[in-house]
Amino acid sequence: MESCNFEVPISYYDKRFSIDAVKLLPGQYFVTTQDKMLVTVLGSCVAACLYDPETGIGGMNHFMLPTVNKTASEFEKTQGMAAKYGVHAMEILINDLVKAGANKAQIKAKVFGGGKVVPSFVQHDVGKFNAEFVTDFLSTEGIPILASDLCDVYARKVYFFPSNGNVFM
């Protein structure tokens, strides 16, 4: 079983890791029960890699902002772009993991991104806001963060293996 949002992520075969892979772009998420690798590139965005180590079910999201701003269109709030906001992306990811058979009490997290990659944004450190949001959200949900690489001033490329929880950067 697999689930994703409105816009289907790009699937390909990764020769380096010898595995089917799914590339996530900003505002996308993907949940799978299969042995696949999920890949994304992050700047100020954050990716939450969640998995149930007992079932091997896992998924990743890639959100751009912590919450919906007041000027977002009604379409963005309710349809395909909802996953670009952390508040929706996290709920959707957790709900789809449970629908796929994961036990919410067993879900573990690894979170990445939130870099300050555009230094001219002095007033609004979006990466910091994203990083604070994801750690607070997971704490509230009772989902432990086993690994993280958040904030700082660099971009990241994340390779996540949901079946076993391994992550490479």
Set out the residue ranges of the language-model regions.
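Divalent-metal-activated hydrolytic enzyme cores
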Residues: 127-169
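Phosphate-centric recognition/catalysis
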Residues: 2-16, 20-36, 40, 54
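Conserved active-site and cofactor/substrate-binding residues in soluble primary-metabolism enzymes
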Residues: 4, 19, 24, 41, ...
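Short glycine-rich phosphate-binding loop at a beta-alpha junction
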Residues: 105-113
